[in-house]
From Swiss-Prot:
Subcellular location: Cytoplasm
Designated name of the protein: Ribosome maturation factor RimM
Domain comment as written in the entry: The PRC barrel domain binds ribosomal protein uS19.
Protein family according to the UniProt entry: Belongs to the RimM family.
Function recorded in the entry: An accessory protein needed during the final step in the assembly of 30S ribosomal subunit, possibly for assembly of the head region. Essential for efficient processing of 16S rRNA. May be needed both before and after RbfA during the maturation of 16S rRNA. It has affinity for free ribosomal 30S subunits but not for 70S ribosomes.
Designated gene of the protein: rimM
Length: 171
């Protein structure tokens, strides 16, 4: 089976017309949940269920409300709560230099002055720039803004990120 990457989790239904609420976990949510997009549905044990074609999608608060083709009633989609939607690797677009997909960054080792400080576990999108969450042993998570003075170098092939922890970031 080809490689798939998680783009969201179905967290609930929306209304009676077969729409679902999806909590996005992707860097291109508008594209992933727009009309015509094809997503793969996986159950809570990561078993492939079927491909889904987006009929409509809209942002509502922190969720995307999505209607898939062929699902017309709440009873058609209620069983998919907790399931995950993914995109096939072949459907990902090429990125420009200096751009990365979340799955390329999450799991990378983070170094400050060549000292391993942790691993990126999550990427948040609170506003102007992304924030990378670094899991550390014996310490609380470190929140790193993805800005040039902090993130010095990203080596996707080596799963390595070099950073400069500025004063005040690790208090």
């Amino acid at each position: 089976m080809e490689n798939f990457y998680k783009v969201g989790t179905i967290v609930n239904t929306q209304g009676l017309q077969g729409e679902v609420r999806i909590l996005p976990s992707t860097d291109f949510a508008n594209e992933r949940f727009s009309k015509g997009a094809v997503l793969a549905l996986f159950d809570d044990k990561d078993n492939y269920i079927q491909d889904l074609k987006v009929k409509s999608g809209r942002l509502q608060k922190n969720f995307y409300v999505v209607k898939f083709e062929g699902f017309y009633h709440i009873n058609d989609v209620e069983k998919y709560k907790g399931y995950v939607v993914k995109i096939a690797q072949e459907n990902q677009e090429e990125l420009n230099d200096g751009e990365f997909y979340y799955h390329e960054i999450i799991g990378s080792d983070v170094y400050d002055n060549d000292i391993l400080i942790g691993q990126i576990s999550e990427i948040l999108q609170p506003g102007a720039n992304d924030v990378w969450v670094v899991k550390r042993k014996g310490k609380r998570d470190l929140l790193l803004p993805y800005i040039p003075p902090v993130v010095l170098k990203v080596d996707v092939a080596q799963h390595r990120v070099d950073v400069d922890i500025m004063e005040g970031l690790d208090d």
